[in-house]
């Protein structure tokens, strides 16, 4: 008799995706982040659902409803901090996942890569809207500053901003719609993640060597299921350590002050995972130019497959490109640091240099170095 998991219409999909899936035998721990992102998403949806049961999306009660969750709801504090710090873990995994894709040339799978970019944008939008919900000072002013950037769009900008706000400032209408979108977006992200996997399974996984692994495949289960479980346990250990020992480490103290439109905080800054993009935005004196640079800092990923000039797929055997990749990593860390600093000398200049370097590495230096490496292969 044929096994039910191979014949049942639903079980067959699960079987072909997670059990009998042929996987390369040499994929490293850098390939763990996809499953970790799935775990993060499930965790965020679950904790978010329980938070939504007690949260009220009204400017008068939003802040106190979050306080109520932390003080009065059974284990509300741990659910709230798991959700807040879960977002940080989500973005750590996202950055590692994208970095792995850049390093090993996974962007050659164009459909998978492009869906991944859409996923990144959707996750960033969700996180931004979620940050507004507690209705603290940084929530309010962050929402005001970031939505206001759209006013830089010529002709329709001002109307667009007021349409998003639902009025002439960030107010009750804005909070209500942000809550609605923040609730629905994770489910859209889950659907997109399935599309992401669908496209990936059309081609099969890449591997560290960058050469085809068709001649040496192993079943996903038990080899990679057990490997993923180890990754998940490590992720949960880090998350729970953060939640239980220093839940406010990555947050902003200003967000413990209720939103006040009459009092601007001295330094308006987003959560740490947006600081690199925020630094790029601030390093350009022109408003429209800054907004374009902000969008392009992520959208540039869509150009990466078209800028691939190397004869080899990954960077495993390309030491010069490796140096550039780690320079890019250091540059992004520098931008993250600058994004959290006040706008004054020398931070302005450092931010501008780091921003120029970011675009130069991806658009000019990497393709050039790849051509040089191709020529070195001839020697």
UniProtKB/Swiss-Prot annotation:
Heme b b562 binds at residues 83, 182. The chain crosses the membrane at residues 33-53, 77-98, 113-133, 178-198, 226-246, 288-308, 320-340, 347-367. One of its GO terms (molecular function) is metal ion binding. It is found in: Mitochondrion inner membrane. The keyword Electron transport applies. Its cofactor is heme b. Pfam families: Cytochrom_B_C (PF00032), Cytochrome_B (PF00033). One of its GO terms (cellular component) is mitochondrial inner membrane. A ubiquinone binds at residue 201. Heme 1 (or BL or b562) is low-potential and absorbs at about 562 nm, and heme 2 (or BH or b566) is high-potential and absorbs at about 566 nm. Component of the ubiquinol-cytochrome c reductase complex (complex III or cytochrome b-c1 complex) that is part of the mitochondrial respiratory chain. The b-c1 complex mediates electron transfer from ubiquinol to cytochrome c. Contributes to the generation of a proton gradient across the mitochondrial membrane that is then used for ATP synthesis. Belongs to the cytochrome b family. The cytochrome bc1 complex contains 11 subunits: 3 respiratory subunits (MT-CYB, CYC1 and UQCRFS1), 2 core proteins (UQCRC1 and UQCRC2) and 6 low-molecular weight proteins (UQCRH/QCR6, UQCRB/QCR7, UQCRQ/QCR8, UQCR10/QCR9, UQCR11/QCR10 and a cleavage product of UQCRFS1). This cytochrome bc1 complex then forms a dimer. This is Cytochrome b. It comes from Vulpes lagopus (Arctic fox). The gene is MT-CYB.
């Amino acid at each position: 008799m044929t096994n039910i998991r191979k014949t049942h219409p639903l079980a067959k999909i699960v079987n072909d995706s997670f059990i009998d899936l042929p996987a390369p035998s040499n994929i490293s721990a850098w390939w763990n982040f996809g499953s970790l992102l799935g775990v993060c998403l499930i965790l965020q949806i679950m904790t978010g659902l329980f938070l939504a049961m007690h949260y009220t999306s009204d400017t008068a009660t939003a802040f106190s409803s979050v306080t109520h969750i932390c003080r009065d709801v059974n284990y509300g504090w741990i659910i709230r901090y798991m959700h807040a710090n879960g977002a940080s873990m989500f973005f750590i995994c996202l950055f590692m996942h994208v970095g792995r894709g850049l390093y090993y040339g996974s962007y050659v799978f164009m459909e998978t890569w492009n869906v991944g970019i859409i996923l990144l944008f959707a996750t960033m939008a969700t996180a931004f809207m979620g940050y507004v919900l507690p209705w603290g000072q940084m929530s309010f002013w962050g929402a005001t500053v970031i939505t206001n950037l759209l006013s830089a769009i010529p002709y329709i900008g001002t109307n667009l901003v007021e349409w998003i706000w639902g009025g002439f400032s960030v107010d009750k209408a804005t909070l209500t719609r942000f809550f609605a979108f923040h609730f629905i977006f994770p489910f859209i992200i889950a659907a997109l993640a399935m599309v992401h996997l669908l496209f990936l399974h059309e081609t099969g996984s890449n591997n560290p060597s960058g050469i085809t692994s068709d001649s040496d495949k192993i079943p996903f289960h038990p080899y990679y299921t057990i490997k993923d479980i180890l990754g998940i346990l490590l992720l949960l250990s880090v998350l729970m350590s953060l939640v239980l020992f220093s839940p406010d480490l990555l947050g902003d103290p200003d967000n413990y002050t209720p939103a006040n439109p009459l009092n601007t905080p001295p330094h308006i800054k987003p959560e740490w995972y947006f600081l690199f993009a925020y630094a790029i935005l601030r390093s350009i004196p022109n408003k429209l130019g800054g907004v374009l640079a902000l969008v392009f800092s992520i959208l540039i990923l869509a150009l990466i497959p078209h800028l691939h000039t190397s004869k080899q797929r990954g960077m495993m055997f390309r030491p010069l490109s490796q140096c550039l990749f780690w320079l890019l990593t250091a540059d992004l860390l520098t931008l993250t640091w600058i994004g959290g600093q006040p706008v004054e000398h020398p931070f302005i200049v450092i931010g501008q240099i780091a921003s120029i370097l970011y675009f130069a590495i991806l658009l000019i230096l990497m393709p050039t170095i790849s051509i040089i490496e191709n020529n070195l292969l001839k020697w």
